[in-house]
Amino acid sequence: MMTDNSKTRVVVGMSGGVDSSVTALLLKEQGYDVIGVFMKNWDDTDEFGVCTATEDYKDVAAVADQIGIPYYSVNFEKEYWDRVFEYFLAEYRSGRTPNPDVMCNKEIKFKAFLDYAMTLGADYVATGHYAQIKRDENGVVHMLRGLDKGKDQTYFLSQLSQEQLQKTMFPLGHLQKSEVRAIAEQAGLATAKKKDSTGICFISEKNFKTFLSHYLPAQKGRMMTVDGRDMGEHAGLMYYTIGQRGGLGIGGQQGGDNKPWFVVGKDLSQNILYVGQGFYHESLMSTSLDASVIQFTREVPEEFTLECTAKFRYRQPDSKVTVHVKKDKAKVVFAEPQRAITPGQAVVFYDGHECLGGGIIDMAYKDGEPCQYI
């Protein structure tokens, strides 16, 4: 017997892209009562005075009309500024490299938007993220990696709570990106051939360095090797991240070998950028980290130890770790030394296909000694 979904209202976060368009289409085809909502999170008028959000909203309207669903626009610019952008700036100010997408999902898409959807009578919200939701026999929701390994977005969803996941659907989780495009083209959706957006949501195609300098004045300083050799001037610590290769302007200067130069450390108090040669420079390697803002996707004890795998950046294979959790903090010990563990980035825990949750990296250690990364 077919399930009658018509009494279940799903509010879809629609960005004007192909993924969220197909999300709305699939739910409509499955018989749900679907409403589309466009979130305006940033005043993003480009240098020609064209507001790109207006163009995206037109695409949302076109797709919603095509599939026959009502649609609305909601303005979250204030919430986004207060909860995501201020955090983003504060992290850069403190010498860290934040991941605003993780915070945007936690605070906007699955908090501000979820709350708004409830005022529309939603039973669930849905987005075009590549992740899967599975309910067990006890009604507990588990978040699994998206089937398309190259598109899996659980890393960015790792701060979601059980309460948030209970109200969430990810209709694209079992599909490959190529299948999603094919569905859009077959249905003749207005967004079928639209290219994927890249970069941080509020910077879009803008030059990151220029963008950041509008909000944080850059302080130039010295670029040094770990053993104290002066390598010239850096443009401002906020422009560099641990393990970065390009943009140092010292490619022609050699040490004792011809290996490329990398950012291997920062000293915020002295405004010094440390550089070293070699991808696996010893200063880039660490054996453990401290993390805070620890969030698990289901209820867990206040203190426990967990053996699992982890990712320390988005496109990276899993590594075996032991996690010692105490309330909202954790010490993560690596089975093998790891390269360029970056304060401000997310550490995300996995058990096979399941994403267990994660936290924000505060400090990396090498054999118990803090690494000079901030």
From Swiss-Prot:
Protein name in the entry: tRNA-specific 2-thiouridylase MnmA
Catalytic site: 104 (nucleophile), 201 (cysteine persulfide intermediate)
HAMAP family named among the record's database cross-references: tRNA_thiouridyl_MnmA
GO-annotated molecular function: ATP binding; tRNA binding; tRNA-uridine 2-sulfurtransferase activity
Function: Catalyzes the 2-thiolation of uridine at the wobble position (U34) of tRNA, leading to the formation of s(2)U34.
Annotated catalysed reactions: S-sulfanyl-L-cysteinyl-[protein] + uridine(34) in tRNA + AH2 + ATP = 2-thiouridine(34) in tRNA + L-cysteinyl-[protein] + A + AMP + diphosphate + H(+)
Similarity comment text for this entry: Belongs to the MnmA/TRMU family.
Keywords for this protein: ATP-binding, Cytoplasm, Disulfide bond, Nucleotide-binding, RNA-binding, Transferase, tRNA processing, tRNA-binding
Segments for region (Interaction with target base in tRNA): 99-101
Region (Interaction with tRNA): 151-153, 313-314
Its EC number(s): 2.8.1.13
Biological process according to GO: tRNA wobble position uridine thiolation
PANTHER family for this protein: MITOCHONDRIAL TRNA-SPECIFIC 2-THIOURIDYLASE 1 (PTHR11933:SF5), TRNA 5-METHYLAMINOMETHYL-2-THIOURIDYLATE -METHYLTRANSFERASE (PTHR11933)
